[in-house]
């Protein structure tokens, strides 16, 4: 980007001065990422960049259609995973082994990284949780280097109870 006096004045070849991000909430700013995206829009506007927020009411339908058509410039979505997540669905690219085809990886990021694929398959083949954590950490480092996503929040399974109704000394 060309920057003059702290403002973007021109985009490089193949880039634009504005992009649209599709948010899959209910169309009322209720997606967990909506606030951070709104703040990013304001910050980018200060330097001359326009981020268009398309907060759709049909959520994943619009995003899914856009992703499948290859027209989504930017998008946000929450992936669900088990406590020991298998990364194949999201990041695996080897078509011969279930990537980028029906029943395999969604391949939305378009990453084709043999090292990442090998680490995913190696982790998938082990039942050792400690070993899998090490491999998944390596995978996440590679994914961060690809800069295809920005992790915005993390959910953790939790149990909520009232200590007035549950004797906490009985919890193990």
Each model region followed by its residue ranges:
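Short, solvent-exposed loop/beta-turn-alpha elements that line the ligand-binding surface or hinge
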Residues: 1-15, 64-70, 90-125, 154-172
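Append "and occasionally in soluble cytosolic enzymes with long acidic Gly/Pro-rich linkers
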Residues: 1-42, 131, 138
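Active-site lining segments that contact anionic ligands and/or coordinate catalytic metals
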Residues: 14-19, 71-72, 147-149
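Periplasmic binding protein-like
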Residues: 21, 45-99
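Solvent-exposed loop/turn segments at secondary-structure junctions
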Residues: 25-29, 58-60, 79-84, 141-142, ...
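Surface-exposed patches in mature extracellular/periplasmic domains of secreted proteins
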Residues: 51-56, 131, 135, 154
